């Protein structure tokens, strides 16, 4: 069974990843690093049902400072999940957003590798590109490049579109696009919504499924060192390959 760690586990996708990991018989341990403990009733119930499986490190210090805990955690995480992200409005500036999203992600990824992590799973964004003129897409692309430079045994990058689902911290733009995406799917075909909007639970299922497959060496296309999932790949894994995540 796999040992895991996650940062960003209180967010929309991250909280669903935590729930899936807690429910999975293929996962032995979850190290949860966050500013606050899980707060959803579903997660709390799952933790109560699997108390020996879950360990939390709660700190209000900057996430980059959590690296020392990660290096010494036991058991060492074989799979590391990162959904760590924020908005410029929440961070206060583009520089502050970069410090959290890029610098903290890279510092924690480096610490995970030093601790013995074999598989790194990053939830990024559609359009991520280090050469993009759009600050957000460039930021996401820079994160991906820096993670790839760390040269994990296996790296999985998911690039979902706008995320739909119930989040604690409502983001206005994502909410509007999610409504439009849902309407498009209802009025036309489900694949139309899937083209630009991804359900957070499906992204979480795809993340866990791909991570476990990479650790086992059962990826569909063989032993892939880097696997990038977007659009239909996320939908396929999230909807039809649940066995890997359960």
Curated annotation (Swiss-Prot):
Could you confirm whether the keyword Kinase appears in this record? no
Q: List the disulfide bonds.
A: none
Q: Tell me, what is an example of a GO biological process annotation in this record?
A: import into nucleus
GO CC aspect terms: mitochondrial outer membrane
For this UniProt record, the keywords arranged alphabetically read as follows:
Membrane, Mitochondrion, Mitochondrion outer membrane, Transit peptide
- Establish whether keyword Membrane is in the entry: yes
| Compartment annotation | Mitochondrion outer membrane
> What positions does the transit peptide occupy in this chain?
1-37
Name of the protein in question: Protein FMP52, mitochondrial
- Whichever gene encodes this chain, its name is FMP52
